[in-house]
Swiss-Prot record:
Entry keywords, A to Z: Disulfide bond, Hemoglobin-binding, Secreted, Serine protease homolog, Signal, Sushi
GO cellular component: blood microparticle; extracellular exosome; extracellular region; extracellular space; spherical high-density lipoprotein particle
Family the UniProt entry places it in: Belongs to the peptidase S1 family.
Pfam families registered for this protein in UniProt: Trypsin
PANTHER family: COMPLEMENT COMPONENT 1, S SUBCOMPONENT-RELATED, HAPTOGLOBIN-RELATED PROTEIN
GO BP terms, alphabetized: zymogen activation
Keyword Ribosomal protein applies: no
Source organism of this protein record: Homo sapiens
MF GO annotations: hemoglobin binding; serine-type endopeptidase activity
Signal peptide positions (record): 1-18
Protein name in the entry: Haptoglobin-related protein
Amino acid sequence: MSDLGAVISLLLWGRQLFALYSGNDVTDISDDRFPKPPEIANGYVEHLFRYQCKNYYRLRTEGDGVYTLNDKKQWINKAVGDKLPECEAVCGKPKNPANPVQRILGGHLDAKGSFPWQAKMVSHHNLTTGATLINEQWLLTTAKNLFLNHSENATAKDIAPTLTLYVGKKQLVEIEKVVLHPNYHQVDIGLIKLKQKVLVNERVMPICLPSKNYAEVGRVGYVSGWGQSDNFKLTDHLKYVMLPVADQYDCITHYEGSTCPKWKAPKSPVGVQPILNEHTFCVGMSKYQEDTCYGDAGSAFAVHDLEEDTWYAAGILSFDKSCAVAEYGVYVKVTSIQHWVQKTIAEN
């Protein structure tokens, strides 16, 4: 409950008011700073308090967060009794969101913390990739990222100690475990659990998981990362680019020659075939020929829902080898893996 604060609300209907709660402190209000409320005819003073959360957290409760002292000296909420609320992290609400006039291959620098869900993962051979914070203790990345410099026989227990992970402004966080998707050869996804919850703030914030499909053809999303830039060197600065969702038929034809299994043949212009199936969608290049590149995998295709003013992870970048040479990057649909994600988090 460390993120839970409480303040007193006063109603001139109750008994004698004796204390003011603020944060984790209880202050006696019998002195001059907090004078006793004046009495009113045919009425009384009732004392109660209301829980509130710190910045970047919100109250989760079936009640209203207001607790009243009953005759047994118990603090009770009308809806939930003595059950306390929780403060959960806000997701998808960056303080300084990216906007369309700002424009990682040739992308613009993220100087304002527009992508607080973006994490940086480094393998034991110093290869940099991306990961995406989805709550205070869990991140999504690709299975390929987790297996970098490991044999196919490596287990999740073998992999976890070899990874270094940073969130926010180079904040090192410790990894407790990694969990690979049971069908990771076809669904290129894995989860990372941290040993401790991160403190959510302006620089560190999860992105929301979608309740609907945002991977519609033509929809524009933002992708951030530390991948190779236009000089094919890894960047020390987080960059981002705006990219449109592409037609799946065109994407499959580009990489496999045909959507018909009978006529499919490898024809990737970069010599590596992406995983293309019902769990993926494709994204094209920007009008400036900007694209993702090596090292950006694991980053989110972040979509801004204007009606809700909330950012959602529509996809996780799996194939980051297009580098403005191939026409399409390939992403794992978050809606396709969401049940597995929620189940895995609940069980771990």
